[in-house]
Amino acid sequence: MTTESIFITTLPMDFNSQFDNITIGLNDNETLCENWREIHHLVFHLANTCFAAGLVIPSTLNLHMLFLRGMLCLGCTFFIIWAVLFRCALDIMIWNATFLSINFMHFVYLVYKKRPIKIKKELKGIYHRMFEPLHVSPELFNRLTGQFCEIKTLAKGQTYAVEDKTSVDDRLSILLKGIMKVSYRGHFLHTISANAYIDSPEFRSTEMNRGETFQVTITADDNCVFLCWSRERLTYFLESEPFLYEIFKYLIGKDITTKLYSLNDPTLGKKRKLDTQPSLCSQLSVMEMRNSLASTNDNEDGLQNFLRGTSTTSSQRNKQQEFYNAYGVGPLSHAVFC
């Protein structure tokens, strides 16, 4: 028995007649397709043109999503007009009204996200100098500075921290305006200029060990304005924002490096900047240097020799290495912060 005979025996008795009807129907349809209907109204073609224009907008365009949603909304609107005025098709109108509502809500959301975000006048400097080059958005910056920090002032001569008295656990600050000077036992160490952390060495070195005090005195050398975070609340916030956490690690590390090199040449804090600044290992910071000074009684000669410095980079490094060897802090590493 052939395959064809098996197939015929398994079919119902009236299948052949139904199949003939279907064949005839298909032939009729093929004949009818020769009579094309007239072209739809211009509104129909405008709708499809809007859809096509929205889809071909390049994704590299900054506002391509806004243009896409706008063209989809316009296309749906034309389809609704066409369905109501020229086709009287309720289903086409309902579907396109639904699509129009969805796309319009998305369009409004995108416009809201693109709105210009205002940054406080006092904070624009540190945003443009420190955070914007690292691709921190204004919205994220406002979250960082708007919840658990405040802007404070210090008059000339007032102290931000006093050695052996002020706790390092309470705050972290960035100087917005003015100049501060850092001294140890009456000896000037370096200055802190605007757009720099005030207590970054203490913040880094006491992340694991709390309850310590400043080993230096920080005094306002001018009328100063600074941004002050609550350290505990800032730590909790950064734990929920991994991107900002890495930004803070980088900025604090860079600030510590700048402070370290300004110990040999105080003019670095005001007039000069190092193009390529080698850094310390993560365990080595200015705070450890300060603690090493505090733990040594006979350190006046070493401090004076260290602060004297020389004009060349190689001699600066030699002086620093001698200083660290003398006070038992450990070898100096010249790895670069990433």
Curated annotation (Swiss-Prot):
<keyword id="KW-1133">Transmembrane helix</keyword>
<dbReference type="GO" id="GO:0005923">
    <property type="term" value="C:bicellular tight junction"/>
</dbReference>
<feature type="topological domain" description="Extracellular">
    <location>
        <begin position="1"/>
        <end position="40"/>
    </location>
</feature>
<dbReference type="GO" id="GO:0040017">
    <property type="term" value="P:positive regulation of locomotion"/>
</dbReference>
<dbReference type="GO" id="GO:0034446">
    <property type="term" value="P:substrate adhesion-dependent cell spreading"/>
</dbReference>
<feature type="glycosylation site" description="N-linked (GlcNAc...) asparagine">
    <location>
        <position position="21"/>
    </location>
</feature>
<comment type="function">
    <text>Cell adhesion molecule involved in the establishment and/or maintenance of cell integrity. Plays a role in vamp3-mediated vesicular transport and recycling of different receptor molecules. May be involved in the formation and regulation of the tight junction (TJ) paracellular permeability barrier in epithelial cells. May induce primordial adhesive contact and aggregation of epithelial cells in a Ca(2+)-independent manner. May be involved in epithelial movement during corneal sheet formation and regeneration.</text>
</comment>
<dbReference type="GO" id="GO:0005198">
    <property type="term" value="F:structural molecule activity"/>
</dbReference>
<feature type="transmembrane region" description="Helical">
    <location>
        <begin position="66"/>
        <end position="86"/>
    </location>
</feature>
<dbReference type="InterPro" id="IPR018490">
    <property type="entry name" value="cNMP-bd_dom_sf"/>
</dbReference>
<dbReference type="GO" id="GO:0070587">
    <property type="term" value="P:regulation of cell-cell adhesion involved in gastrulation"/>
</dbReference>
<keyword id="KW-0472">Membrane</keyword>
<keyword id="KW-0812">Transmembrane</keyword>
<dbReference type="InterPro" id="IPR055272">
    <property type="entry name" value="POPDC1-3_dom"/>
</dbReference>
<dbReference type="GO" id="GO:0030552">
    <property type="term" value="F:cAMP binding"/>
</dbReference>
<keyword id="KW-0796">Tight junction</keyword>
<protein>
    <recommendedName>
        <fullName>Popeye domain-containing protein 1-A</fullName>
    </recommendedName>
</protein>
<dbReference type="GO" id="GO:0016328">
    <property type="term" value="C:lateral plasma membrane"/>
</dbReference>
<dbReference type="GO" id="GO:0051146">
    <property type="term" value="P:striated muscle cell differentiation"/>
</dbReference>
<dbReference type="Pfam" id="PF04831">
    <property type="entry name" value="POPDC1-3"/>
</dbReference>
<dbReference type="GO" id="GO:0016020">
    <property type="term" value="C:membrane"/>
</dbReference>
<keyword id="KW-1003">Cell membrane</keyword>
<keyword id="KW-0965">Cell junction</keyword>
<dbReference type="GO" id="GO:0007507">
    <property type="term" value="P:heart development"/>
</dbReference>
<dbReference type="GO" id="GO:0042383">
    <property type="term" value="C:sarcolemma"/>
</dbReference>
<keyword id="KW-0325">Glycoprotein</keyword>
<feature type="region of interest" description="Disordered">
    <location>
        <begin position="296"/>
        <end position="317"/>
    </location>
</feature>
<feature type="transmembrane region" description="Helical">
    <location>
        <begin position="92"/>
        <end position="112"/>
    </location>
</feature>
<dbReference type="InterPro" id="IPR006916">
    <property type="entry name" value="POPDC1-3"/>
</dbReference>
<comment type="similarity">
    <text>Belongs to the popeye family.</text>
</comment>
<keyword id="KW-0130">Cell adhesion</keyword>
<feature type="glycosylation site" description="N-linked (GlcNAc...) asparagine">
    <location>
        <position position="29"/>
    </location>
</feature>
<feature type="topological domain" description="Cytoplasmic">
    <location>
        <begin position="113"/>
        <end position="338"/>
    </location>
</feature>
<dbReference type="GO" id="GO:0008360">
    <property type="term" value="P:regulation of cell shape"/>
</dbReference>
<dbReference type="GO" id="GO:0090136">
    <property type="term" value="P:epithelial cell-cell adhesion"/>
</dbReference>
<dbReference type="GO" id="GO:0001921">
    <property type="term" value="P:positive regulation of receptor recycling"/>
</dbReference>
<feature type="compositionally biased region" description="Polar residues">
    <location>
        <begin position="307"/>
        <end position="317"/>
    </location>
</feature>
<dbReference type="GO" id="GO:0043087">
    <property type="term" value="P:regulation of GTPase activity"/>
</dbReference>
<feature type="transmembrane region" description="Helical">
    <location>
        <begin position="41"/>
        <end position="61"/>
    </location>
</feature>
<dbReference type="InterPro" id="IPR014710">
    <property type="entry name" value="RmlC-like_jellyroll"/>
</dbReference>
<feature type="topological domain" description="Cytoplasmic">
    <location>
        <begin position="62"/>
        <end position="65"/>
    </location>
</feature>
<dbReference type="GO" id="GO:0016192">
    <property type="term" value="P:vesicle-mediated transport"/>
</dbReference>
